[in-house]
Amino acid sequence: MTAHLADILVYTLLGFAVLYPFFFWFTPRQKIDSGFYNFNLGLVGLIGGMALILTWATEMERTHVFGIAGWLGLHLLVTYLCWNSEKISIMVISFAAFVGCVIFMVLAIDIIPAGNSYLIIFTGFVSQAILAGVIFAMILGHWYLNVIQLPIVLLRKTANALAFLLVIRLIWNLIQFKSLVVIDQYGKTLTAYQYITTLDGFFLGVAVFFGLL
């Protein structure tokens, strides 16, 4: 139980940390102050550090420990070079994030061995990108409270990207839910949609409504 919890935490923390920097594409340095980059790059380093500590403390495979450590070292180097800089290359930040994505894919396939690797990677990237997008949009929204005349287009682009990811996730969830079958107490096989219309499936229907829709 503890091992599975650690896997979930590492999976979530690492996925968030490696996908978060890609949202910088919606906030170019020319339109926002360096403090925004400092804070968010530092946040990624902190979350990535937590993933590394958990990986090491729970004695996961050394390849994962070294992989996360290598990515984190690269990210911290990029953070050092970009700190308070007037010329920040989003390409460089994205390269470090791409390296992290490769590490994340290897980790995801290893801790979720049962199933199609492509589906695992797709689901993981979409889910973690949504989490990263929500936090990024929240921080960006708070930035508007402290910075005068910050272009609203930055938040609009971020919100549009997040909405796009949410639509993809919703469609994917509905497709997966449609393929689910349930055998009721009478031995009758029902589709998930049929099951939630029964009295026994009422609470599942509530969960679907709030969780998917």
Predicted regions and their residues:
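A cytosolic-side transmembrane-helix exit/cap motif
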Residues: 59, 113-117, 145-146
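Hydrophobic cores of alpha-helical transmembrane segments in multi-pass integral membrane proteins
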Residues: 3-109, 124-143, 160-178, 182, ...
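Hydrophobic, small-residue-rich membrane helices and short re-entrant helix-turn-helix hairpins
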Residues: 146-159
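Helix-coil boundary and interhelical linker segments in multi-pass alpha-helical membrane proteins
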Residues: 1-4, 109-119
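Peri-membrane helix termini and adjoining interfacial loops of integral membrane proteins
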Residues: 181-189
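Non-transmembrane, amphipathic alpha-helical segments
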Residues: 117-123, 127, 153
